[in-house]
Amino acid sequence: MEFVRKKLEPHGFSWDFPMAVARRFSIVNSKIVYKKDLVAEYSDYYKRISKANEKKFLALLQKFYADSRFQKFYNNHLPLYKECEEAMQTMVDKIDFGWYDRFFGPKQNCEQNVFLGILIGGANYAVHNKKSAKGKDVEIVDAVMGCCSKRDGRIYYGPEYTLPIIIHEFNHSYCNPLNEEVWEKISDKATELY
């Protein structure tokens, strides 16, 4: 944590960024490795962490993974994770994802995912990445959803607070490019208002 506090936080390692970093790695045979399909220079990723600090962070993360026996912890909590997944799936099944293309127009090469951030409290946010697939860049929007409730002893994501957030986060992949197209025309007024 000292490394994160001293070396990473001053450059924006907060809020959504730990998930952005985590999204770039996977665990293979108890080793944390880079995902090869993600576009390395996408977004502001390397403005917020240098490659040297990323490498150091990865080494510290690997040490934590081994020292904490994280895989055992994860395996012990699989029933909870499965229950959370099933509860969230009931929410995701209610979303008409085709509406986005009908309303905004078709969007090619976009992948949308929901990640469950069980320990982040009520916070919600999105992490954006790109990956190469079949010679094309694919935009990835990961909606990271915070805490859930219990209802009748079961994990519960209420539609009144869950659905609007997921819909909002996935709207960004359609709305942000529209904003970028007209930003020069609206930037003065937008800056004045916000």
Where are the model-predicted features located?
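Active-site recognition of the HExxH zinc-binding catalytic motif
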Residues: 160-184
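Non-catalytic architectural context of zinc metalloproteases
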Residues: 1-90
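Ser/Thr/Asn(+Pro)-rich, low-complexity disordered segments
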Residues: 1-11, 95, 99-105, 123-125, ...
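Beta-strand/loop-rich accessory regions of lumenal/periplasmic or secreted enzymes
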Residues: 118-120, 151, 155, 171
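Flexible internal linker/loop segments at domain or repeat junctions
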Residues: 182-194
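Auxiliary, metal-adjacent structural segments of Zn-dependent hydrolase domains
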Residues: 77-141
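Solvent-exposed, acidic/flexible segments
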Residues: 89-93, 156-164
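Active-site scaffold of zinc-dependent metalloenzymes
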Residues: 43, 124-160
